[in-house]
Amino acid sequence: MLELDLQRATDAAAPDDAAFRRWCELALRQRTADSEMTIRLVDEAEGRELNHTYRHKDYATNVLSFPADVPDDLLDIPLLGDLVICVPVVEREAREQGKALEAHWAHLVIHGCLHLLGYDHIEDDEAEEMEALERELLAELGHPDPYADDETDSITH
């Protein structure tokens, strides 16, 4: 079971709670243990501040992933971690890349959840594995390959 804490720290329009839950559950289905995670939706100012604080980059990025570093046996529900998603960046990227907004939201939530599970895209072989899983999960939702028109990974973090 997934315990999802969705924090809407901005008034900007974003998908409904059910969509976030559906995307998270899809990305996390390989995990057999119960999970607890938070998704915080933020404006550009908070996104920039967090990206600067944790990544030393002075701009707002689309999604930041903060995997929990807590042994599973310390909590009743294993804490998976937190995602921070900057709503204006998601909207701008979808528009600039000519992607359907819902598909881009689904991609970024799935991408962030995979980071919480330990996937990464620093090395080429890791990126290929992660992107293949993203493509597979998004296809199950009826969304196109998010990397089809890209020479490189479009995720900016």
Curated annotation (Swiss-Prot):
GO molecular function, one term: RNA endonuclease activity
InterPro entries: MetalPrtase_cat_dom_sf_prd, YbeY, YbeY_CS
Top class in the EC scheme: hydrolase
The organism's taxonomic lineage, starting at the top: Bacteria, Pseudomonadati, Pseudomonadota, Gammaproteobacteria, Pseudomonadales
NCBIfam families, per the entry: rRNA maturation RNase YbeY
Known role: Single strand-specific metallo-endoribonuclease involved in late-stage 70S ribosome quality control and in maturation of the 3' terminus of the 16S rRNA.
Coiled-coil regions listed: none
Compartments it resides in: Cytoplasm
Record's cofactor remark: Binds 1 zinc ion.
Cofactors demanded by this protein: Zn(2+)
Protein keywords: Cytoplasm, Endonuclease, Hydrolase, Metal-binding, Nuclease, Ribosome biogenesis, rRNA processing, Zinc
Protein family membership: Belongs to the endoribonuclease YbeY family.
Gene encoding the protein: ybeY
Native source species: Pseudomonas entomophila (strain L48)
Listed Pfam families: YbeY
Biological process terms in GO annotation: rRNA processing
Protein name as it appears in the record: Endoribonuclease YbeY
Protein origin, superkingdom: Bacteria
PANTHER family, A to Z: ENDORIBONUCLEASE YBEY, CHLOROPLASTIC (PTHR46986:SF1)
EC number: 3.1.-.-
Binding site for Zn(2+): H111, H115, H121
One Gene Ontology term, aspect cellular component: cytoplasm
